[in-house]
């Protein structure tokens, strides 16, 4: 019930709600999702047609045997192998089923709305916001619907002609030092190196900027086909953030996520 109270709290956004239900009810998908849906390849057979890197890297295979700092990492032989593997996720989703379903996008929009509506108390609407690993851009779209006009996304593979997300690497941002007001990601389990990624995100944030991560829970059984790292305890990730940031603004746990908002990067 608390989820729905948050969902329908004050300050409604008509544009957000209209687009949310268009995503749910439009046959064949709405907006950019419709373009992705058209890319479904009914002749594609995964076991026959999958990329060679997927023979090594899948849900149960391609992982290192030992843990490091509470983390299990994929056994990539090079950064190029990592990039190749990560770029395949969207391609496979589109070929096999046309990307996310209408209900998936509807559900993601509601979850992002609950997350991001809190930000209006902390940031001006012209804040510089970067969403890392944004794929088709649902989180960017919701931020803009909430009034954050300078929200943008990056992804290794954002799909063709994506109006919301540019090609970019969350491990190696193009953004200058001290330039972002907020950085958001819900794909930190796709990092090549978690500590290096946090340091890179900290670098690009302004001294009093915010970092918002969705941290996957219930990962004791390991990651899925495309996760690059997994952890048994979310605390191991949160502690890494506390070493880099001065203040925890908010922590909230959901069934699949622990979302953590921190502010104020530590001086090196």
Q: Predicted regions span which residues?
A:
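Class I SAM-dependent methyltransferase Rossmann-like catalytic core
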Residues: 41-124
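Conserved Class I S-adenosyl-L-methionine
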Residues: 218, 223-252
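A short SAM/SAH-binding and catalytic strip from SAM-dependent methyltransferases
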Residues: 181-194
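A short acidic, Gly/Pro-enriched loop at the edge of an enzyme's catalytic core
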Residues: 171-183
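Core SAM-dependent methyltransferase catalytic element
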Residues: 246-268
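Class I SAM-dependent methyltransferase SAM/SAH-binding core
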Residues: 128-172
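Conserved beta-strand signature within the Rossmann-like core of class I S-adenosyl-L-methionine
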Residues: 208-218
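A short glycine-rich, Lys/Arg-flanked "PGG" loop and its adjoining helix->strand segment in the class I
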Residues: 195-210
């Amino acid at each position: 019930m608390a989820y729905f109270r948050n969902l329908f709290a004050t300050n409604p956004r008509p544009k957000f709600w209209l687009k949310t239900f268009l995503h749910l009810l439009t046959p064949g998908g709405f907006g950019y999702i419709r373009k992705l849906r058209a890319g479904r390849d009914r002749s594609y057979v995964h076991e026959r047609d999958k990329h060679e890197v997927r023979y090594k890297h899948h849900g149960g295979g391609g992982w290192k045997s030992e843990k490091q700092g509470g983390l299990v990492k994929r056994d990539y032989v090079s950064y190029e192998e990592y990039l190749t593997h990560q770029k395949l996720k969207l391609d496979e989703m589109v070929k096999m089923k046309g990307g996310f379903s209408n209900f998936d996008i509807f559900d993601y929009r509601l979850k992002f709305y609950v997350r991001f509506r809190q930000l209006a108390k902390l940031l001006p609407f012209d804040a510089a916001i970067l969403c890392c690993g944004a794929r088709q851009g649902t989180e960017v779209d919701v931020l803009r619907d909430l009034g954050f006009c300078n929200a943008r996304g990056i992804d290794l593979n954002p799909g063709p002609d994506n109006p919301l997300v540019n090609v970019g690497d969350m491990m190696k941002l193009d953004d200058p030092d001290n330039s972002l007001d907020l950085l958001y990601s819900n794909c930190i389990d796709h990092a090549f190196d978690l500590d290096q990624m946090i340091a890179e995100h900290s670098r690009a944030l302004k001294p009093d900027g915010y970092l918002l991560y969705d941290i996957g829970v219930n990962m004791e059984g390991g990651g899925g086909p495309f996760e690059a790292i997994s952890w048994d305890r979310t605390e191991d990730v949160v502690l890494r953030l506390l070493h880099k940031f001065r203040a925890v603004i908010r922590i909230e746990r959901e069934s699949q996520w622990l979302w953590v908002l921190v502010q104020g990067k530590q001086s090196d």
